[in-house]
Regions:
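Conserved AMP-binding
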Residues: 1-4, 77
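Conserved AMP-binding/adenylation subdomain of ANL enzymes
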Residues: 3-43, 58, 113
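Gly/Ser/Thr-rich phosphate-binding loop
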Residues: 16, 39-47, 56-127, 140, ...
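AMP-binding/adenylate-forming catalytic core of the ANL superfamily
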Residues: 45, 165, 170-171, 188, ...
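Active-site glycine-centered loops adjacent to acidic/histidine catalytic or metal-binding residues
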Residues: 76, 100, 133, 195, ...
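Conserved ANL (AMP-binding/adenylate-forming) active-site segment centered on the GW(Y/F)…HTG consensus within
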Residues: 92, 124-129, 154, 167-194, ...
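Conserved beta-loop-beta connector loops within the AMP-binding
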Residues: 135-162, 181, 201-202, 264-268, ...
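Acidic/polar alpha-helix N-cap and adjacent early helical turns
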Residues: 310-319
């Protein structure tokens, strides 16, 4: 019951309102999911991007449409904008992007549009939906630099994300790992999430990386998530991961690791060129590697520790 944020607390909230719950069990392939959704007439779903990737690929290859599903909550890891667009424009499914942690019991933020956003162009709305969103009642957020100094809510500065609230953990079982809490200059205690994020003037938070996954190049930070999101927008890319590879001059440089869609072809040069205009020049990957599959945790997140181990001796062409 305590596995992965206790199923996002859905067993409790659904029971409270008398909602039927449908569980897929171990059959998380696209075909099985689609058949389950249709048979059980699912209207609302919740899951991680990796699961929805398999579902959307199956539906796209077989030209299928949902008959009942109209909303989905996506969390667990950052949802690529291309996935949100596909759900909404190709299948008429409204996406709610959310973020939280088991330590937060579990919900922290939800990305819903404010009234002033409703008349914005589609791309502008998508940019807002792609953020993890605003904090729910009872949860406070802030971002700080490595010295603990508060950073501005300007949507540009990114730093270590801290949270606090009445139902947020202040430690671990039997004190494992020591006291995680951070005190600010006013003596307030904050829980460090391990995420790096920005917060815009409207309070929308966006995860740019896990602190351990940020690529530190020439003294600056590069977001692996932003690069992955840009890569999966390419029509030939099924899934992508970006890790930092040691570089003699820049300390680290990004390596893009790609799984191609079935029967699709794309070259290293085409993918690197695809980043033109989407990210800063110095963010662009130094190299691309194609693989059959990427490693994932039991909860569907990319297992970057395994990728870093597999590619620890990789030599970049720019090194």
């Amino acid at each position: 019951p305590m596995f992965h944020a206790n199923a996002w607390a859905l067993p409790y909230s659904c029971a409270l309102v008398g909602t039927k719950m449908v569980f897929p069990g171990y059959q998380l392939d696209g075909k099985s999911l689609f058949e389950l959704f249709e048979t059980e007439r699912v209207t609302v779903s919740a899951g991680v991007p990796t699961v929805w990737l398999a579902l959307l690929q199956h539906m796209g290859q077989n030209k299928l449409k949902f008959s009942t599903m109209n909303r989905t909550v996506i969390g667990g890891s950052a949802c690529p904008p291309a996935m949100i667009r596909s759900f909404q424009e190709d299948y008429g499914v409204q996406v709610l992007h959310a973020w939280g942690m088991t330590e937060m019991s579990p919900l922290g933020t939800v990305s819903t549009l404010k009234s002033k956003h409703l008349d914005l162009p589609k791309d502008s709305k998508l940019a807002i939906q792609s953020k993890q969103g605003r904090s729910i009642f009872g949860v406070d957020l802030k971002i700080v630099d490595d010295a603990g100094k508060d950073l501005p809510w300007d949507g540009k500065a990114f730093g270590n994300l801290l949270v606090r609230g009445p139902w947020i953990s202040n430690g671990y079982f039997k004190g494992e790992g020591g006291d995680p809490m951070r005190k600010d200059e006013d003596g307030m205690e904050w829980f460090p999430t391990g995420d790096v994020a920005t917060i815009d003037p409207d309070g929308y938070m966006q995860i740019t990386d896990r602190s351990k996954d940020v690529i530190k190049s020439g003294g600056e930070w590069i977001s692996s998530i932003d690069l992955e999101n840009a890569a999966v927008a390419h029509p030939a890319v099924a899934e992508a991961a970006v890790i930092g590879i040691r570089h003699p001059k820049w300390d680290e440089r990004p390596l893009l690791i790609v799984v191609k869609k079935k029967d699709s072809q794309v070259t290293r040069e085409e993918l690197i060129k695809f980043f033109d205009g989407k990210v800063a020049k110095w963010w662009m990957p130094d190299d691309v590697v194609f693989v059959e599959q990427l490693p994932h945790t039991a909860t569907g997140k990319l297992l970057k520790t395994k990728l870093r181990e597999d590619f620890k001796d990789y030599k970049l062409p720019t090194a």
